[in-house]
Amino acid sequence: IIGPVLGLVGSALGGLLKKIG
């Protein structure tokens, strides 16, 4: 469970960072 969740969270954070940065 933790693996896939971290992947989704990581991708989400990456998208936000790209939008902000």
From Swiss-Prot:
UniProt entry keywords in alphabetical sequence: Amidation, Amphibian defense peptide, Antibiotic, Antimicrobial, Cytolysis, D-amino acid, Hemolysis, Secreted
Tissue expression as described in the entry: Expressed by the skin glands.
Compartments, as annotated in UniProt: Secreted
Modified sites of kind D-allo-isoleucine: 2
Chief location of this protein within or outside the cell: secreted
Gene Ontology process terms (BP): defense response to bacterium; killing of cells of another organism
Domain of life of the organism encoding this protein: Eukaryota
GO cellular component assignments: extracellular region
Annotated positions of the Isoleucine amide modification: 20
Membership in a protein family: Belongs to the bombinin family.
Function text: Has antimicrobial and hemolytic activities.
Protein name: Bombinin-H5
Taxonomic source organism: Bombina variegata (Yellow-bellied toad)
